[in-house]
Amino acid sequence: MKIRSSEITMSAVNKSQYPAEGIPEIALAGRSNVGKSSIINTLLNRRNFARTSQTPGKTRTINFYLINNEFYFVDLPGYGYAKIAKSEKEKWGGIMERYLESRQELCSIFLLVDIRHEPTADDKLMYEWIKHFGYNCVVIATKADKISRGQYQKHISIIRKKLQMESSEKVIPVSSLKKTGVEELWEEIVNQYNQHGYEITVD
């Protein structure tokens, strides 16, 4: 994928702040500090474009990144950080639900989980939420450089079993550090847009 332009256009907490151009979107969901910002930076080959936070749970807005003036990556607020107050968790839930239930431009959701660990109850709930709202789900298994390639299938099987994934749904191991899996991930991003009738320029 040739990246000609990329910019953050909006940080939103309610519908009135969402972009209104009708440009298609793919959203990234995952636990706090699972690596969403790092994945965005890696996909765009830009360092510190999407800011990585040292404070889990800090991102509480929906961030829209416009790529090549053709499509959006949407960075959803991280979940699962125990030290966040109950009121903040409820606020997060409202922000997420409003986006997922009403966003016609949203094509698919990519759920990020740490390949080293069994998905958490929050990951399972997020997966079920994605399916409840009728979206395709692709799982990105982050931090793939932390285990050997020979262990990939074992860990992917654990992820599939814990989330109770459909056999047709993909799990893609990705390392932001070593760029492992980035090409396959781009192919799947383009594929998801194509499935929804959008032609994305790849070169």
Curated annotation (Swiss-Prot):
GTP binds at residues 30-37, 57-61, 75-78, 142-145, 174-176. The keyword GTP-binding applies. It comes from the Bacteria. InterPro entries: G_ENGB_dom, GTP-bd, GTP-bd_ribosome_bio_YsxC, P-loop_NTPase. Signal peptide: none annotated. Keywords: Cell cycle, Cell division, GTP-binding, Magnesium, Metal-binding, Nucleotide-binding, Septation. Mg(2+) binds at residues 37, 59. Residues 22-195 form the EngB-type G domain. One of its GO terms (cellular component) is cytosol. Coiled coil: none annotated. GO terms for biological process: division septum assembly. It holds the Pfam family MMR_HSR1. Its cofactor is Mg(2+). GO terms for molecular function: GTP binding; metal ion binding. HAMAP family: GTPase_EngB (MF_00321). Belongs to the TRAFAC class TrmE-Era-EngA-EngB-Septin-like GTPase superfamily. EngB GTPase family. Necessary for normal cell division and for the maintenance of normal septation. NCBIfam families: GTPase_YsxC (TIGR03598). This is Probable GTP-binding protein EngB.
